[in-house]
Amino acid sequence: MTFEQLIPLIIMAFALGMDAFSVSLGMGMMTLKIRQILYIGVTIGIFHIIMPFIGMVLGRFLSEQYGDIAHFAGAILLIGLGFYIVYSSILENEETRTAPIGISLFVFAFGVSIDSFSVGLSLGIYGAQTVITILLFGFISMLLAWTGLFIGRHAKGMLGTYGEIVGGIILVGFGLYLLFPI
């Protein structure tokens, strides 16, 4: 792979990773430990490897009509997660709230990586080099997710108890933006 072929993939990886960065800002406003932040970033990175890989494999066989479905599903997942965070911030005590682990972490990672499935479909149709592409997507998304989580964590300190509500609203807003782009 030449440098000229690598540059568009790096740009695409940053574009896909910005989804993870944006929603990680909101997720970072939850009360998270450093270990949880690292785990969330790694999970997002792994999903940004798995989803485009599946998309690239299927892209060789399927039409482009599934791109809109993936985009819609990702938006709905983000909106649902955002409402859940707002709900839990308002109605639950700090002690009873849990960090995103288990299924909620996978739902979050799936939601921010589903757009990479659509990109994988397109890249699969055009025969992009799979290994380099998915590793770039995963690594850059992981770094951007960590950046968003750390920034969100520090912003929560400035926003006080309203930080998680703001984070949930960011997720809802981002999901709505995916559904209804301006």
From Swiss-Prot:
Localization of this protein: Cell membrane
Any one GO molecular-function label of the UniProt entry: manganese ion transmembrane transporter activity
Membrane-topology annotation of the record: Multi-pass membrane protein
Keywords: Cell membrane, Ion transport, Manganese, Membrane, Transmembrane, Transmembrane helix, Transport
Transmembrane segments: 6-26, 37-57, 71-91, 101-121, 131-151, 162-182
Disulfide-bond pairs as recorded: none
Pfam families according to UniProt: Mntp (PF02659)
Primary localization: membrane
Domain of life of the source: Bacteria
GO CC entries: plasma membrane
Family statement drawn from the similarity comment of this UniProt entry: Belongs to the MntP (TC 9.B.29) family.
HAMAP family (alphabetical): MntP_pump
Function: Probably functions as a manganese efflux pump.
Full protein name: Putative manganese efflux pump MntP
Annotated organism of origin: Bacillus cereus (strain AH187)
Gene assigned in the entry: mntP
